[in-house]
UniProtKB/Swiss-Prot annotation:
Protein name stated in the entry: Type II restriction enzyme SfiI
GO molecular function annotations of the record: type II site-specific deoxyribonuclease activity
Catalysed reactions listed for this entry: Endonucleolytic cleavage of DNA to give specific double-stranded fragments with terminal 5'-phosphates
One Pfam family it belongs to: RestrictionSfiI
Major enzyme class: hydrolase
EC number: 3.1.21.4
One of the GO biological process terms: DNA restriction-modification system
Keywords from the named record: Endonuclease, Hydrolase, Nuclease, Restriction system
Keyword Glycosyltransferase: no
Amino acid sequence: MHQDYRELSLDELESVEKQTLRTIVQALQQYSKEAKSIFETTAADSSGEVIVLAEDITQYALEVAETYPINRRFAGFIDYKRVRWLPSPHGLLPQVLLVDAKASTEKNRDTLQRSQLPMDAEFRNTSSGEVVTMEAGVIPHLMLQSANDGVLPAVTTSIFVHFYYRELKDVEGRYRELKSIYVLSLPHARLKQRYNPDPDTSFFGAGKHSPARGEVARIRVYFDRLKEACPWRLQELHYSADSEYTQPRWRDLNDAGHEVTKEFLFLER
């Protein structure tokens, strides 16, 4: 049984990321009723304040979803950061779980700063044909000193939670409608050759920033391209009219390699 993620095969590393994502999706599903109430009935003066609201809700959802913690801190520009032990079929692995919350009236992309990027990215600019690159800002692992003279790398796992909503006007007590919660798992740096081997095989695109104004460079992740590369890496928890909770659906691949969605059971918080 492994403790060093670098000893895992790429398939095993993918399964660790998939297991982590599945836990996050379960936690968000179980909190989705309260999340909708908080998100829709809390006043916010700007889109930036709505994002802060999404960050708080994500924290609330995940506070009961933790595994055995490791008493270390991870410094970084991510909303939710936890160093912990992760039980897996491949061993008990130290992990740095990184979860960042977004909120937008768009449902097709997320914008990341370099400090949130887990793997070196490259893509071809659709208008100019120029190849654009951005180095990863998230380290692949955090080295931990053991009590018995060993060193363990805690693998970083990057998850993004995207709150998709629309603004409401003249609706008493409600300021916006939360329509879906998207949950993305971006691949670890070791998986770059699987997901972004060249500029033309990429789910990345140009981010919105102004070099002339000295703004920090950003990069976009496109949902449809990520789902095409690996269906389970993009999950959607959708609110329907007949339930206070989101629909508990998990996207995956079947044995024939076709995309399927399956309903899962969940508990009330």
